[in-house]
Amino acid sequence: MENRKREKGAPFIEIKDLSYAYPGEEGRGQQVLSHINLTIREGEYTVILGHNGSGKSTLAKLINLVIDDYTYAEGQILVGGRDVMADDLAEKDLLELRRQVGMVFQNPDNQLVATIVEEDVAFGPENLGISNPELRERVDAALATVGMSEYAHHEPHRLSGGQKQRVAIAGIIAMKPRCMIFDESTAMLDPLGRREVLATMEKLNREEGITVLSITHYMDEAARADRVIVLSDGQILLDGTPGEVFAHADTLRTAGLDVPQCTAAVQYLQARGVCIRGDLNTPEQCAAALLDAWRTRGGAGRTQAGK
């Protein structure tokens, strides 16, 4: 599928004919990924969609080296040109690869390690050997980026879910990654927390230039990305801009997914002759397109065929 927004920069993550199965009790276990070929470029905001068991989280953990048992793995995963599955990777190389690709998990409580917010943010860079005054600068800058500066001296356990997740994100930012993977990072949050974290993700990509790879099953989150990849049963089913992917509503349904509600509503109207043009992925875009159609057709908004 053509992707008009894909050319962001040089390839940063390259996955070549990757297949993976988890080790079982008696050898090879369940096949999770099959012949994945994928390139993520510097500066892209990419969402990987899929139902439970599609392989999306396994793929993310392989990229970040959270999973490092390659007994039943085939193919290559290149991060910044380095093969993360190579047998000759030294420990320092593994640490550097993990620094370049930070990961934010579903439950922030599992990622927070200190009793004070700023100490938690400092934990990662301290372990990289960063000391003051640079450490202080990194912590302050990271908290400012996620809008949590005023909570620097608070206890993490007293924060809301969205605030905790932003602190976890700040801890990754302080290590200055080139890419951040968000693995279902909004799944446990209330609507306000989700909005806070999504706004932070967009800011990191649009303003800081960080490559963002978001693993989710929320279609409205995918609508705001540059690129959407749909996994089903360990294989890439669709790959394109949000609009291109959402145009394949029937294919999405076979994968246990659906288009965003606002997009479905517009598609329903289009199928009945209403002329609606433009990007139709977010509620704001759909509302603007509907209003434009109403104005253009003097309140009718119908094509000649629909009259």
Cite the ranges covered by each PLM segment.
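Conserved ABC ATPase signature
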Residues: E155-L159, Q163
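Conserved ABC ATPase "signature" region
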Residues: D83, P133-Y151
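A short, flexible loop at the N-terminus of ABC-type nucleotide-binding domains that lies
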Residues: E2-I15, Y20-H35, I67-Y70, D87-D93, ...
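ABC ATPase NBD Q-loop/coupling interface
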Residues: Q76-E96
